[in-house]
Amino acid sequence: MRTLALSLALALLCLLHTEAAATVPDRSEVAGKWYIVALASNTDFFLREKGKMKMVMARISFLGEDELEVSYAAPSPKGCRKWETTFKKTSDDGELYYSEEAEKTVEVLDTDYKSYAVIFATRVKDGRTLHMMRLYSRSREVSPTAMAIFRKLARERNYTDEMVAVLPSQEECSVDEV
């Protein structure tokens, strides 16, 4: 669960990534609360555990020019699990890293910065390369358009319907609670 959450954090951070012709978004467009509402992966852990997963909440804050902090709240069998992770920019445009447990890179496939973002993450750990796609939303209820974009991009990356999970909303924990 921790590695999944850390990968989610890195993906959120890379919402700063833009296409070459696009303008870098204002920090206020990236900062704030996000909900991880859908996932796609072919990893054994995901395929085994996806039915138990619920929506994760995250809050992005800027610590400086090159650092972001992400606070998380995720329901677990032992209650609400909360943690924070700090990410640093690399020399590559639009790339951020967190390397405590594994090498992680992310790519923003599609976003409007206002309501949704589709992220593709790659993680290398113990010589294995793992991939996961995520749909982030500013609200618990993702728009049908954003969900359609996510599903289309998942198919393009060869994820089957069995490899996609729309995460149920949860009220157990929030990044807003102390």
UniProtKB/Swiss-Prot annotation:
<dbReference type="GO" id="GO:0007507">
    <property type="term" value="P:heart development"/>
</dbReference>
<feature type="binding site">
    <location>
        <begin position="134"/>
        <end position="136"/>
    </location>
    <ligand>
        <name>1-tetradecanoyl-sn-glycerol 3-phosphate</name>
    </ligand>
</feature>
<dbReference type="GO" id="GO:0032496">
    <property type="term" value="P:response to lipopolysaccharide"/>
</dbReference>
<comment type="function">
    <text>Siderocalin-like lipocalin tightly binding a variety of bacterial ferric siderophores, also binds long-chain unsaturated fatty acids such as linoleic acid, oleic acid, arachidonic acid and, with a lower affinity, long chain saturated fatty acids such as steraic acid. May act as an antibacterial factor, through dual ligand specificity, both as a siderophore-sequestrating molecule and a lysophosphatidic acid (LPA) sensor.</text>
</comment>
<keyword id="KW-0391">Immunity</keyword>
<feature type="binding site">
    <location>
        <position position="104"/>
    </location>
    <ligand>
        <name>1-tetradecanoyl-sn-glycerol 3-phosphate</name>
    </ligand>
</feature>
<dbReference type="InterPro" id="IPR012674">
    <property type="entry name" value="Calycin"/>
</dbReference>
<keyword id="KW-0044">Antibiotic</keyword>
<dbReference type="GO" id="GO:0070540">
    <property type="term" value="F:stearic acid binding"/>
</dbReference>
<dbReference type="GO" id="GO:0043066">
    <property type="term" value="P:negative regulation of apoptotic process"/>
</dbReference>
<dbReference type="GO" id="GO:0015908">
    <property type="term" value="P:fatty acid transport"/>
</dbReference>
<dbReference type="GO" id="GO:0032332">
    <property type="term" value="P:positive regulation of chondrocyte differentiation"/>
</dbReference>
<feature type="modified residue" description="Blocked amino end (Ala)">
    <location>
        <position position="21"/>
    </location>
</feature>
<dbReference type="GO" id="GO:0010831">
    <property type="term" value="P:positive regulation of myotube differentiation"/>
</dbReference>
<dbReference type="GO" id="GO:0050544">
    <property type="term" value="F:arachidonate binding"/>
</dbReference>
<dbReference type="InterPro" id="IPR000566">
    <property type="entry name" value="Lipocln_cytosolic_FA-bd_dom"/>
</dbReference>
<dbReference type="GO" id="GO:0009636">
    <property type="term" value="P:response to toxic substance"/>
</dbReference>
<feature type="binding site">
    <location>
        <position position="43"/>
    </location>
    <ligand>
        <name>enterobactin</name>
    </ligand>
</feature>
<dbReference type="GO" id="GO:0070543">
    <property type="term" value="P:response to linoleic acid"/>
</dbReference>
<dbReference type="Pfam" id="PF00061">
    <property type="entry name" value="Lipocalin"/>
</dbReference>
<keyword id="KW-0399">Innate immunity</keyword>
<dbReference type="GO" id="GO:0008284">
    <property type="term" value="P:positive regulation of cell population proliferation"/>
</dbReference>
<dbReference type="GO" id="GO:0055089">
    <property type="term" value="P:fatty acid homeostasis"/>
</dbReference>
<feature type="signal peptide">
    <location>
        <begin position="1"/>
        <end position="20"/>
    </location>
</feature>
<dbReference type="GO" id="GO:0005504">
    <property type="term" value="F:fatty acid binding"/>
</dbReference>
<dbReference type="GO" id="GO:0009410">
    <property type="term" value="P:response to xenobiotic stimulus"/>
</dbReference>
<dbReference type="GO" id="GO:0045663">
    <property type="term" value="P:positive regulation of myoblast differentiation"/>
</dbReference>
<dbReference type="InterPro" id="IPR002345">
    <property type="entry name" value="Lipocalin"/>
</dbReference>
<dbReference type="GO" id="GO:0006954">
    <property type="term" value="P:inflammatory response"/>
</dbReference>
<dbReference type="GO" id="GO:0002062">
    <property type="term" value="P:chondrocyte differentiation"/>
</dbReference>
<dbReference type="GO" id="GO:0034097">
    <property type="term" value="P:response to cytokine"/>
</dbReference>
<comment type="subunit">
    <text>Monomer.</text>
</comment>
<keyword id="KW-0964">Secreted</keyword>
<keyword id="KW-0813">Transport</keyword>
<dbReference type="GO" id="GO:0071399">
    <property type="term" value="P:cellular response to linoleic acid"/>
</dbReference>
<dbReference type="GO" id="GO:0030154">
    <property type="term" value="P:cell differentiation"/>
</dbReference>
<keyword id="KW-0929">Antimicrobial</keyword>
<keyword id="KW-0408">Iron</keyword>
<dbReference type="GO" id="GO:0005615">
    <property type="term" value="C:extracellular space"/>
</dbReference>
<comment type="similarity">
    <text>Belongs to the calycin superfamily. Lipocalin family.</text>
</comment>
<dbReference type="GO" id="GO:0055001">
    <property type="term" value="P:muscle cell development"/>
</dbReference>
<dbReference type="GO" id="GO:0015909">
    <property type="term" value="P:long-chain fatty acid transport"/>
</dbReference>
